[in-house]
């Protein structure tokens, strides 16, 4: 059962081939047997089985929805009632939330069964899942490699079939990059599509939740439940709720008469900036092969330009740390979170609690953010970065005049070895070159498995990035689903799984 996708598990439940409790027990045992991956930071079998029993009751009563009884793992950045919610930090090591994040609540209302909370880079700050207080996550494809970050635990859990799906968050690539490195499918929706209420904040103008699963069809099902307006999130979009599955299996034109060329009429934009120096040859080969497959499906490839791509790194690493320094000021050891055992006075308690509670990367970003927001530097750094951010968004709109979707690599390379970039944060930041601009513009983007590296990296997956215009998630999922109907990269699993 553990090899099945969400849609296949739904069919198995409907056919009475298994129960929700049996499914939950299967995944709980797999999580226990594969602890060495370090994908999970908190598992509570009692709560999981209680949820599964409730789901079985709904199924027996004929009240099951599309997701009822299906297991889900939650990134530990989403607060979850009666579960530890740590954001991968010592600061929140023992914090138990009194309420559910909107994402958690909506998936629970849909009948999904939580099998645990997944590991992550501390406060979602990282690209490798090495910054977690609970230790690094291993990539199931190659235990020496990182799984990507910051949603590395979620990606590893889905890749290793410890859960059929998981939630993630994406601030600068934290759904797409680990999905690419771990050989699964993940989508970051348009900013505001998924509520941030109960999502422990990193950078509020960038953070966005999304689903991670084996297939685009699974992601569409999850997004149906996760998305929609939430009055408790001031940045939540008021758009009418959509059915993100509505185009799956259809021709791009909608005429229904092009089964051999289902994507005839689709224009795929290829940014020349995404295919230049710095892109590894093995990644380029996998992306080129995927693009040839799209041509075989009827799509037309056109060159476009995103001229400010290189500026996305400095812009992001001004704006995101600035917002983080503000958001993380709430962790002071007074109301909740870690408090130093010994201190002289209130100020000393603040200093020691934060010094002990935050890890090195979080401290680095707080310092950078505080600096760029300080008097005398605000205009030179933060304000300038916001102006360039607007230009980056305009570049995408110009590109979309010539294409329907944009495609390219998710990352310049496959996953690197654990520890390989830990001493050089700039090298780590450069790995996000193809994802940051999408987040800065607030656009939807996704990663789809499309191949593997070469030589010593032959077991390390490569992901194809698909970028859509605002609110175009349903069409992006259609494009990804067409590729997955024609290929089997998404079906592949790590050895021993």
Curated annotation (Swiss-Prot):
Q: Which GO terms describe its biological process?
A: translation
Any Pfam family from its record, for instance, is Amidase
**This protein's name:** Glutamyl-tRNA(Gln) amidotransferase subunit A
| Class in the EC hierarchy, top level | ligase
Q: Which reaction does it catalyse?
A: L-glutamyl-tRNA(Gln) + L-glutamine + ATP + H2O = L-glutaminyl-tRNA(Gln) + L-glutamate + ADP + phosphate + H(+)
Annotated active site: 75, 150, 174
What does this protein's UniProt record list under function?
A: Allows the formation of correctly charged Gln-tRNA(Gln) through the transamidation of misacylated Glu-tRNA(Gln) in organisms which lack glutaminyl-tRNA synthetase. The reaction takes place in the presence of glutamine and ATP through an activated gamma-phospho-Glu-tRNA(Gln).
Q: Which gene encodes it?
A: gatA
Q: Which UniProt keywords apply?
A: ATP-binding, Ligase, Nucleotide-binding, Protein biosynthesis
Report whether ATP-binding shows up as a keyword of the record.
yes
| Assembly and interaction partners | Heterotrimer of A, B and C subunits.
| UniProt-recorded Gene Ontology molecular function terms | ATP binding; glutaminyl-tRNA synthase (glutamine-hydrolyzing) activity
Q: Lineage from the top down?
A: Bacteria, Pseudomonadati, Pseudomonadota, Betaproteobacteria, Burkholderiales
- HAMAP family given for it? GatA
Q: What is its EC number?
A: 6.3.5.7
For the keyword Ligase, the answer is yes
């Amino acid at each position: 059962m553990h090899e099945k996708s969400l849609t296949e598990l739904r069919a198995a439940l409907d056919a009475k081939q298994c129960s929700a409790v049996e499914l939950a027990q299967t995944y709980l045992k797999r999580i226990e047997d594969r602890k060495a991956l370090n994908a999970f930071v908190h598992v509570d079998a009692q709560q999981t089985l209680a949820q599964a029993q409730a789901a079985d009751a709904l199924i027996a009563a004929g009240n099951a929805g599309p997701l009822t009884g299906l297991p889900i793992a939650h990134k530990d950045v989403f607060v979850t009632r009666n579960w530890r919610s740590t954001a991968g930090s010592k600061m929140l090591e023992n914090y138990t939330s009194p309420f559910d994040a909107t994402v958690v609540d909506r998936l629970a209302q849909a009948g999904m069964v939580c099998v645990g909370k997944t590991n992550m880079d501390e406060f979602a700050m990282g690209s490798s899942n090495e910054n977690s207080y609970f230790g690094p996550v291993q990539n199931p494809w190659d235990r020496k490699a990182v799984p990507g970050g910051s949603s590395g635990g979620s990606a590893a859990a889905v890749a290793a079939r410890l859960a059929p799906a998981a939630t993630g968050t994406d601030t600068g690539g934290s759904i797409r990059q680990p999905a690419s490195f771990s050989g699964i499918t993940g989508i970051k929706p348009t900013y505001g599509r998924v509520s941030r209420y109960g999502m422990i904040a990193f950078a509020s103008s960038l953070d966005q939740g999304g689903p991670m699963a084996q297939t685009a069809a699974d992601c569409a099902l999850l997004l149906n439940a996760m998305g929609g307006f939430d009055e408790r999130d001031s940045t939540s979009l008021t758009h009418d709720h959509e059915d993100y599955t509505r185009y799956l299996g259809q021709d791009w034109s909608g005429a229904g008469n092009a089964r051999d060329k289902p994507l005839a009429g689709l224009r795929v934009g290829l940014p020349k900036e995404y295919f230049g120096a710095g892109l590894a040859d093995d990644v380029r080969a996998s992306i080129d092969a995927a693009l040839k497959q799209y041509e075989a499906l009827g799509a037309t490839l056109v060159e476009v330009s995103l001229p400010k791509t290189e500026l996305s790194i400095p812009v992001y690493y001004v704006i995101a740390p600035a917002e983080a320094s503000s958001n993380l000021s709430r962790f002071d050891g007074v109301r909740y979170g870690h408090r130093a055992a010994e201190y002289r006075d209130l100020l000393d308690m603040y200093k020691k609690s934060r010094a002990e509670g935050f890890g090195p990367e979080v401290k680095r970003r707080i310092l950078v953010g505080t600096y760029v927001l300080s008097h005398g530097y605000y205009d030179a750094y933060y304000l300038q970065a916001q102006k360039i951010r607007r230009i980056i968004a305009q570049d995408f709109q110009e590109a979309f005049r010539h294409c329907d979707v944009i495609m390219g690599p998710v990352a310049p390379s496959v996953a690197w070895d654990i520890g390989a970039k830990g001493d050089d944060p700039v090298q780590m930041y450069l790995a996000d070159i193809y994802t940051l601009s999408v987040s800065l513009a607030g656009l939807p983007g996704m990663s789809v498995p499309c191949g593997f590296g070469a030589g010593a990296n032959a077991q390390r997956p490569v992901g194809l990035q698909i970028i859509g215009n605002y609110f175009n998630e349903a069409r992006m999922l259609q494009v990804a689903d067409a590729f997955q109907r024609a290929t089997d990269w998404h079906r592949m699993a790590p050895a021993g799984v």
